[in-house]
């Protein structure tokens, strides 16, 4: 072993691995090495203290997770800038991404996407009776989920091809195509041609409201155990909310309607309904008395068939039922779709309820006492009206969708 050059010779410590004894000596040698670094190799250095070097951490490279592209997502769209050909677009609805969805009575849901119209989905429906005569059946309602940004649900109401039932159906939008179709609600549909209702809308409470006509069974409108002649309220999945006014198993929200064919929700949550009045019903006027309810009441009982128009009795009295806010009296207008217009919308309609009529075009409602009044709007507003994300009005008739800024 090496000897220090300036010190007295020290006895060498010999470390040899010789079996168990050798291992013991090795341990002893290591112990000596800790106490005096001169053993088993290098000579000790005066006043030196061994400082252990901490282990150096080795960085493990990490890879950030790669987001999976959503193949169903659609980039933000611009609404249509002009007139769109559309065969009998019964109802219009904008999605939060700017796309315009519209339902054609013959059974196609269409969407304006990337500057062109495409078919989103179709339903098996009919628009005439079995003998080819007039009918109010068809694809009649359309609504966009209030949580569309996350669930992409689109809802529709239609009469089935067998003329025996009506349905609320739901799809999931995937890049402009309806997938995962699911029928949520089914209602019996009588043999009568007309008074089918068929409009749907989401309230500010997130619930789905459905309008049903009384199918020429006037007494059904006052029977809260019968869905006809009613405004019905459901959860988005088609179940009944427990806080409905007539109990947790009853979908009825309001009753006493002949054929409610327009429903609109205001910014403050109030719900308006347009209702087609008597037109040739036995014992009632032959024309007129279409009505508007500006703010639907929870559990509200309205006048049909006890009264029509501004509380004109049909036989007896009105039985304390609620009168409408506006009536066409002895003039038939045939009200259809309705919309509340935002305060930043077109000046002539801002802050008002507007509704289409098949007979006279758009009517603009001004609340008043004792009754509301109406003024005329675009004559093309025959089927439906909606306010676009650009604050323009979009209206439809039997052949086109129009834009009014």
Question: Which sequence ranges carry the predicted segments?
Answer:
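Blade-loop segments of beta-propeller domains
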Residues: 117-145
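Beta-strand-rich domains and repeat architectures in extracellular enzymes and scaffolds
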Residues: 81-107, 333-339
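Asp-box/WD-like beta-propeller blade repeats and closely related beta-sheet repeat scaffolds
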Residues: 167-201
